[in-house]
């Protein structure tokens, strides 16, 4: 349990957030598949990324880590058969991306995860991998971990996804890297494109036309130096905290600003947020900059479904901004939130309601009437890191103490979150 009290002062000064989780995962995987050595700076050290690292080591990949510096000794796409089950723990990225890799090898890989991950749907990845030629045996009519994959000679396919998903797209591109012929993925909206950018950075040739991306099989990857920017999803908690705590003026340094990730900035600015981008530049193929955020009175907003993929991880913290905004805000087209680490729609509705927020559940989103007094009480993260951090930020504006059960879930992506929040709000 973690106790949060109202912020004693505005959030001021500068803060640096840990390395991007999505890019850290992909740097490990592409480095393992490449020829030569890949060096990763500012690697995110958290439960999810370490799950990927541990799985790769079970494939026989040699990896050296010294704090946030990682050296991966590439295998030139020659993994060894794992002698043990591959445990993705709570990480959907680990499970889905490595499924695409596993489908290319002529041996059996057995995957599992924690109780939460074993409830998350996998058919959206496993079915297309089967169409490419992999053999898959999965629990729950082919939809859930644990599952086994025996790969081999894959055939390139053209896939049209019903829902935009960076994890599904990435798994299919990684499988296509070793398939015969070309593999293409077309999405209804553009999801985050770190995999495409990084494949190019590692020497692969891909074609990108609008919502379609295509990769040809048989390509080699070459080890690279990857400098991981700060994680925008992690920065979002401090962005919203600075917007809602009076007298705040915060600069968040070196944040990844990939346009497929920053839908939250668009929505917050529509709500009246005072956010400026400073020192904009590119690093390892990714746009990066500093964010200057000042306290801002916010007004309600309706989030259009087409922007959902560009902010899929930020809805819990957006809900905090909506709770403090004037008027009625609405989110639609976000049913994907129901199959995250928790059912995030239900988690937002149940826990925010306890704190006095007027929130209504929709099948694919929620409605929040902002402006109610926020009340400190006991709430539950539902073992979801983003729910835990969002409740903590909401607690900064609450009357009384907010007690968060299962707050240790933050270790999944940001183990030092509460220490950093305390420094910013109490001047420690």
Swiss-Prot record:
Keyword Transferase attributed: yes
Alphabetized SUPFAM superfamilies for the sequence: EPT/RTPC-like (SSF55205)
Active site: 313 (proton acceptor)
Name of protein: 3-phosphoshikimate 1-carboxyvinyltransferase
EC number: 2.5.1.19
Subcellular location: Cytoplasm
Gene: aroA
Reaction(s) this enzyme catalyzes, per UniProt: 3-phosphoshikimate + phosphoenolpyruvate = 5-O-(1-carboxyvinyl)-3-phosphoshikimate + phosphate
GO CC annotation terms, alphabetical: cytoplasm
Residues annotated as binding phosphoenolpyruvate: 21, 92, 120, 167, 344, 386
Keywords noted in UniProt: Amino-acid biosynthesis, Aromatic amino acid biosynthesis, Cytoplasm, Transferase
InterPro entries cross-referenced by the UniProt entry: Enolpyruvate_Tfrase_dom (IPR001986), Enolpyruvate_Tfrase_sf (IPR036968), EPSP_synthase (IPR006264), EPSP_synthase_CS (IPR023193), RNA3'P_cycl/enolpyr_Trfase_a/b (IPR013792)
Residues that, per the record, bind 3-phosphoshikimate: 21-22, 26, 165, 167, 313, 340
Domain of life: Bacteria
Spans traversing the lipid bilayer: none
Known partners and oligomeric status: Monomer.
Pathway: Metabolic intermediate biosynthesis; chorismate biosynthesis; chorismate from D-erythrose 4-phosphate and phosphoenolpyruvate: step 6/7
GO BP, sorted A to Z: amino acid biosynthetic process; aromatic amino acid family biosynthetic process; chorismate biosynthetic process
MF annotations from Gene Ontology: 3-phosphoshikimate 1-carboxyvinyltransferase activity
Family per record: Belongs to the EPSP synthase family.
Main localization, broad class: cytoplasm
Protein role: Catalyzes the transfer of the enolpyruvyl moiety of phosphoenolpyruvate (PEP) to the 5-hydroxyl of shikimate-3-phosphate (S3P) to produce enolpyruvyl shikimate-3-phosphate and inorganic phosphate.
